[in-house]
C-alpha cells in the first residue's frame, strides 16, 4: 500500500466517522491557525501538515478551515508551545527539546540509541506519553506525539565517541546537548533554520540532524561527512489551545478527536521518517562521505552514552517521578512495536 493510499484511507475513515454522527445543522465555520517553524517546502509539510489539514476540512464538511503558518511566521521555533497556550496559534507543532528541562518526562523519548523505527516508534511514544501529558503539558491539549531519527553530520569524519571532545556541535534538543557535553563537546544552541549559518561561519563544527532535512535546510552545503548510526530521536508534539477546542460544536470536536489519535501519530511518524531516511541515499549520490561504523565502534558509542539515561532517571526522581518505571514503560511500548534498539 502506498503512503498516498494510506493517507487517503485514513482521511476517508475520519470523514465517515464524522458523517456517522447523523444529519445535523451545518456547524458554524471556524478557522484553525496551525503554526510551525519549518519551511513550506519541508517534507513534513507535504507528508504531515497538509494531508492532516485537508482531512480535517473534509471530515468537518468544510466547517473547520485549517490555515497553515510555516517558517516561524507567528513566532520563533522555541516559542510554539507558548503560542498555542496563549492563543497566538490555535494549534502548534512543538519541539519540546528546544526548551531543555521544561518537559522532563517527555525528554525520555529522546534518550540516545533508543528508537530504531520512526513509524512504530512514534505510535509507541504517543501512547506512552498520553499518561503524562495532562500533567506535564497541562496548559494545552495534546493532539499527538511523533518522532524522527537523526545522526551526526560533521566537517570531518567521525567514527569514535572520543573524537567529539573539543568539538562545537549544534544539538537537536536538550537531551542530545547533555550527550554531547558528556562526550566533551561544546554545544552551539541555534534553531534548525539558523544552523547552516552557524556551520558556515565556523561557530559549529558539526550538527545532529535527520538525513533529508539536512537538504531541506541546505545544511548539506556546510557538512560533507555523515555518521551512519541511529544516534538519537527527536520527539515532537502537536498541541492546541484548550479555549479554541472548547468553542467547537460536538460534531467538530469529534472530527478533531479523530485526527488527534495514536493512528495519526504512527502515520505521520512513518511518512516523515521514511522520507528522512531517503536523504542518506541522496547525499551519497551527491558525493558526500557516509561514514560506516564497525560493530565494535557502534558498541563504543552506546557504552559512552549510557550515563545519560542514568542522569535522566536521577533528574526526574528529584521531582517525585519514578524514572525507572516511566522509562521502563516507554521501552516496553517500543519493544512491543518492534521499534527499540
Residue ranges and their predicted role:
Residues 1-11:
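Bacterial N-terminal signal peptides that target proteins for export
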Residues 12, 26-120, 135-341:
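N-terminal secretory/targeting leader peptides
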Residues 15, 20-22:
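N-terminal signal peptide c-region/cleavage motif recognized by signal peptidases
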Residues 123-130:
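Signature of the catalytic double-stranded beta-helix
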Amino acid at each position: 500500500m502506498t503512503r498516498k493510499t494510506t493517507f487517503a484511507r485514513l482521511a476517508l475513515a475520519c470523514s465517515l466517522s464524522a458523517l456517522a454522527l447523523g444529519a445535523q445543522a451545518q456547524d458554524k465555520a471556524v478557522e484553525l491557525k496551525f503554526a510551525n517553524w519549518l519551511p513550506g517546502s519541508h517534507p513534513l509539510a507535504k507528508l504531515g501538515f497538509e494531508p492532516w489539514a485537508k482531512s480535517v476540512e473534509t471530515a468537518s464538511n468544510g466547517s473547520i478551515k485549517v490555515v497553515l503558518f510555516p517558517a516561524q511566521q507567528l513566532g520563533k521555533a522555541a516559542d510554539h508551545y507558548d503560542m498555542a497556550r496563549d492563543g497566538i496559534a490555535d494549534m502548534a507543532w512543538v519541539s519540546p527539546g528546544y526548551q531543555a528541562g521544561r518537559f522532563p518526562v517527555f525528554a525520555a523519548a529522546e534518550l540516545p540509541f533508543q528508537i530504531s523505527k520512526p513509524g512504530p516508534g512514534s505510535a509507541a511514544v504517543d501512547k506512552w506519553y498520553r499518561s503524562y501529558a495532562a500533567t506535564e503539558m497541562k496548559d494545552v491539549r495534546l493532539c499527538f506525539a511523533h518522532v524522527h531519527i537523526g545522526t551526526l553530520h560533521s566537517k570531518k569524519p567521525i567514527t569514535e565517541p572520543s573524537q567529539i571532545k573539543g568539538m562545537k556541535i549544534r544539538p537537536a534538543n536538550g537531551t542530545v546537548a547533555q550527550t554531547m557535553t558528556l562526550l566533551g563537546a561544546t554545544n552551539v544552541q541555534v534553531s534548525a533554520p539558523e544552523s547552516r549559518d552557524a556551520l558556515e561561519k565556523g561557530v559549529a563544527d558539526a550538527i545532529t540532524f535527520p538525513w533529508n532535512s539536512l537538504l531541506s535546510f541546505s545544511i548539506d552545503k556546510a557538512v560533507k561527512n555523515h555518521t551512519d548510526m541511529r544516534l538519537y530521536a527527536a520527539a515532537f508534539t502537536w498541541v492546541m489551545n484548550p479555549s479554541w477546542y472548547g468553542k467547537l460544536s460536538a460534531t467538530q470536536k469529534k472530527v478533531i478527536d479523530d485526527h488527534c489519535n495514536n493512528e495519526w501519530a504512527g502515520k505521520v511518524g512513518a511518512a516523515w521518517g521514511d522520507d528522512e531516511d531517503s536523504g542518506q541515499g541522496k547525499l551519497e549520490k551527491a558525493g558526500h562521505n557516509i561514514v560506516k561504523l564497525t560493530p565494535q565502534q557502534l558498541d563504543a558509542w552506546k557504552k559512552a552514552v549510557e550515563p545519560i539515561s542514568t542522569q535522566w532517571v536521577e533528574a526526574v526522581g528529584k521531582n517525585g517521578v519514578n524514572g525507572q518505571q516511566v522509562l521502563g514503560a516507554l521501552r516496553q511500548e517500543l519493544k512491543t512495536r518492534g521499534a527499540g534498539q
